[in-house]
Amino acid sequence: EKATIRAIAGTAGIDPSLVMRYYGNKGKLFAAAANFDLCLPELSAVSHEELGTVIVQHFLERWEVDDTMVALLRAAVSNEEARLRMVEIFTDQSLPAFEELLTDHAAERAALIGGQMIGFAVCRYILRLSPVIEMTHQDIVNWMAPIVQQYIDTPAP
């Protein structure tokens, strides 16, 4: 967020006007550059009862090791291109994994799980809410896995 177009262009060895010409602003440049692979595990290989646990553990590990997703989430709140990039990550990566796994309302279930995980990420990595930031990984999994599992198991209304 503190980077300037001039500094970015200088690092790339190009004129700042080229960055502005092709991207328009820093937000659009960031959204175009943000590359994040969720590296989802093969969920079909996980026992049904363990899906909530595996999903929460995986997302927690991904958010902890790569600042790109936190930066993209922060930008998505106020920048349309970053928001669209987040939607693209969901549509291209999360949704297909859940569609292979669940036949009943897979898109809705994936969206609810994604919302749960993103809401948690906002609290822990952006707002840095206490006690969320003090919780251990195991505490987080213990609290959140049953909720995610419920999204998977509960019959659709």
Where are the predicted features?
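Short alpha-helical scaffolding segments that buttress acidic/His motifs in well-ordered protein cores
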Residues: 59, 72-76, 113-117, 121
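Helix-turn-helix
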Residues: 1-28, 32
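Amphipathic alpha-helical segments used for helix-helix packing
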Residues: 34, 63-91
